[in-house]
Amino acid sequence: MQSSVNEFLTPRHIDVQVVSPTRAKITLEPLERGFGHTLGNALRRILLSSMPGCAVVEAEIDGVLHEYSAIEGVQEDVIEILLNLKGIAIKLHGRDEVTLSLVKKGAGAVTAADIQLDHDVEIVNGDHLIANLAANGSLNMKLKVARGRGYEPADARQSDEDESRSIGRLQLDATFSPVRRVAYVVENARVEQRTNLDKLVIDLETNGTLDPEEAIRRAATILQQQLAAFVDLKGDSEPVVVEQEDEIDPILLRPVDDLELTVRSANCLKAENIYYIGDLIQRTEVELLKTPNLGKKSLTEIKDVLASRGLSLGMRLDNWPPASLKKDDKATA
């Protein structure tokens, strides 16, 4: 058995092509046939859903009580401002949480560079637009920045303390992952007389807070650590009874409208009685392609949006739908 393991090829050539400061193409070859997709898919999922980073998770704006407000002298409404805050690429050095201030008056654009920073806080995209002010406009806000991993909806951070939280502290859904886009292709590779080998090419783009090469290195480390337990696997003398968790991930109970799909894709899903994210992930690609007016472009959009939240099509949920999810809720969704 040991000799057959040693016959497996291991990658001998790694090439990193820097496309821009935030984008790189990493080529790994040669790989045994099939290992290109095995490694590429695993690394892609980790890069999209499991990379740690920092994001704005809460905003408190003077004169604003809720997100549906408008501010005099500010071109954008509060919802637009909150969406713009999500696009700030920020790094914390040595801290997991910090509160920052932004004060701006008079006509002009308000950008991420206007945020008052501590010495251990860094903003990569200082030219990122937050709002536009008129001559009589002013913007005074406090921003809470936290460290996290992957994607975290605002309601996942709710606790008993939130009930006593002052009115006007607006919670944001946070995308902590510094990875903005990742795709991979598997090409043919050749070693001597063997022509059926794989070459893995990963195209990776980040928000600038993490170098693409470092991102792929961290993803590989996470995968290695998760698989390490299998190397010295030993069976227990007595079977361990694992209690089944009835609790369902809250994100699966959210409506598909929260995925912010195009109108065409959203309407196609609703026509097939797919109202919740939990309904969607249980469908396969083949099933969705049979949906009238839903083509490959819409399917790709759906897969990318799910992947950004650590989900994919074709997943199985044993306890779906939960008892708390009533059928009449779907009728009014």
Swiss-Prot record:
Signal peptide: none annotated. Residues 248-333 are annotated as: Alpha C-terminal domain (alpha-CTD). DNA-dependent RNA polymerase catalyzes the transcription of DNA into RNA using the four ribonucleoside triphosphates as substrates. Gene3D superfamilies: 5' to 3' exonuclease, C-terminal subdomain, DNA-directed RNA polymerase, insert domain, RNA polymerase, RBP11-like subunit. Pfam families: RNA_pol_A_bac (PF01000), RNA_pol_A_CTD (PF03118), RNA_pol_L (PF01193). It comes from the Bacteria. The N-terminal domain is essential for RNAP assembly and basal transcription, whereas the C-terminal domain is involved in interaction with transcriptional regulators and with upstream promoter elements. Homodimer. The RNAP catalytic core consists of 2 alpha, 1 beta, 1 beta' and 1 omega subunit. When a sigma factor is associated with the core the holoenzyme is formed, which can initiate transcription. GO terms for molecular function: DNA binding; DNA-directed RNA polymerase activity; protein dimerization activity. Belongs to the RNA polymerase alpha chain family. This is DNA-directed RNA polymerase subunit alpha. One of its GO terms (biological process) is DNA-templated transcription. Keywords: DNA-directed RNA polymerase, Nucleotidyltransferase, Transcription, Transferase. Its EC number is 2.7.7.6. The gene is rpoA. Residues 1-234 are annotated as: Alpha N-terminal domain (alpha-NTD). InterPro entries: DNA-dir_RNA_pol_insert (IPR011262), DNA-dir_RNA_pol_RpoA/D/Rpb3 (IPR011263), DNA-dir_RpoA (IPR011773), RBP11-like (IPR036603), RNAP_asu_C (IPR011260), RNApol_insert_sf (IPR036643). CDD domains: RNAP_alpha_NTD (cd06928). The lineage of its organism: Bacteria, Pseudomonadati, Pseudomonadota, Gammaproteobacteria, Pseudomonadales. It catalyses: RNA(n) + a ribonucleoside 5'-triphosphate = RNA(n+1) + diphosphate. One of its GO terms (cellular component) is cytoplasm. HAMAP family: RNApol_bact_RpoA (MF_00059).
